Amino acid sequence: MEDTSPQAVAEKAAKDPKAAKDLKDDAAAATKSFPDHFSREGDDQMDFEGVIFSSSPVLDLSQRGLRHLGKFFKIPNLQQLHLQRNLLREIPEDFFQLLPNLTWLDLRYNKIKVLPSGIGSHKHLKTLLLERNPIKMLPVELGQVTTLTALNLRHCPLEFPPRLIVQKGLVAILTFLRICSVEKAFPGDELLPEVSAPKMGSNDLQYPVLPLPRKGSPSENSLNDPDQEKEKADFFPPMERLDLSELRKSNAASEIWPSKEEIRRFWKLRQEIVENEQVEIQEKKLLAVELPPNLKAALNVKEKKHRKPWPAVRKRSTSFKGILPNLPSGYQNTVHANRMEDTHKAALQELQEKETVLEQRRRDKRALQEWREQTQHMRTRRELSKLQPPHSNMMASKIPFATDLTDYEKMPVSPFGKVKPSGEGTAQRPIEISASPLAELEDKIKRHTQQIRTRSFLGTNPMQDIKTANQDLETTKKLQEELRKLKVEMTLNKDHPFPSFTGNLSLHPPASQPQNIFFNTKS
């Protein structure tokens, strides 16, 4: 039976590279699809052990039912490891040392309660996902992972760091863990050696949280008291873990603090941090308002030497700027009112100009319409005047038969003011009456026909042209009707001649001739 232990596989791979390559391919295929017996219920000792040879930088072991992670051998190429939705309860201590190039670790939906402290030595880890794990404390070594850019702690019952720190984000969590790491490296019963503190930037003090001071202030004479030394140790900024095995302990207080200026600077920075924290949490007071008595006594001597007199400052009058609302000045009100008035005037002027233009357009349109109507009316009157016969002829044509046409202006007048009838006119006028209507009617028809032929329709006003054509048609119909009636009358006159229209002299004596009753002036 072939030996499949890790040592045998490694020796075989060293002797036969081709066989090692086949083994790597088989192992990679095996890791991509693990059998279901890894997730058997009741087998609490089931783990995942063995050598994994894979050229791929990604390994997905999610939803495999894994309960324990055995000894992972070195996989230098692995960068992403997915272990979500398993039954893992713990991570091996040397897990992160065996995966030096790991950048992504997904441990969501497991049962992990503690992370190994070896995570602090990792140099490439960027993303750590711990969602839905019953983890309560993060290791302080996690603060040393400077490459970490994403940390998922959703639905984790964390007690350390506090919830306030977790809510502030990754930077606050790492800073808090670094501070706790420094406190763990320098316990309270030991004295801090003389070490020059590194320079701190504003980013390093972004979200620090400091422990509460202990009750009871130390006495000024007991400089080497353990509580006092621990209080002084709290003032140190976060720093990397230092190798202090070769340094000796010192009982002098001057060795604990590098200089008085640094003490003041550190205390000032901490006071600023505390003030920022007190804005959000008013009920908790993290630091005392004043310096401890021993530090105050050490700084008073130097302050007295370098103290300078304050320059005389003129006392300013009480300002009501914060009490009263910001009211605009009178000048600003005037400028604003003038500006609004100018804007209003400009708008009114523009509106008036528009109204003037519109009114002028309406006037021009009305004048043009009136001119067109007047021109059309004059043209109609001119046409009607051409069609109408003279006034005297019209009156003669409308006089009924048996009516004597007498020119009253030319008739002689008797001395008594009465008109004398002329005998010659009454004898010749019936012949003229019978001939003049037909001639006048023929003249009318000729003039109307000639006018229709000479008229030219320009097409500029179609409605007017149609109206004129209808009038011409009506006039033509009237003339035709008059001609028909005149012909009928002439026919009747030929069949029944009257003595008054013959023009012949009557055989009866003058006394028996019929007289015109309209011109009989005798009584």
Curated annotation (Swiss-Prot):
Q: Which UniProt keywords apply?
A: Coiled coil, Leucine-rich repeat, Repeat
Which stretches are tagged as biased composition: Basic and acidic residues? 12-26, 227-236, 372-385
The record ties this protein, via InterPro entries, to: Leu-rich_rpt, Leu-rich_rpt_typical-subtyp, LRR_dom_sf, LRR_domain-containing
Ranges of Polar residues compositional bias? 513-523
Domain of life, source organism: Eukaryota
Ranges occupied by LRR repeats: 55-76, 77-98, 101-122, 124-145, 147-168
Give the transmembrane ranges.
none
Region feature (Disordered): 1-26, 206-236, 372-394, 503-523
Q: Is Metal-binding included in the keywords of this UniProt record?
A: no
Query: Which Pfam families does the UniProt entry name for this protein?
Result: LRR_8
Q: Does the keyword Magnesium apply?
A: no
Q: Which residues form a coiled coil?
A: 335-374, 463-494
Q: What is this protein called?
A: Leucine-rich repeat-containing protein 27
In the UniProt record, what gene is named as encoding this protein?
Answer: Lrrc27
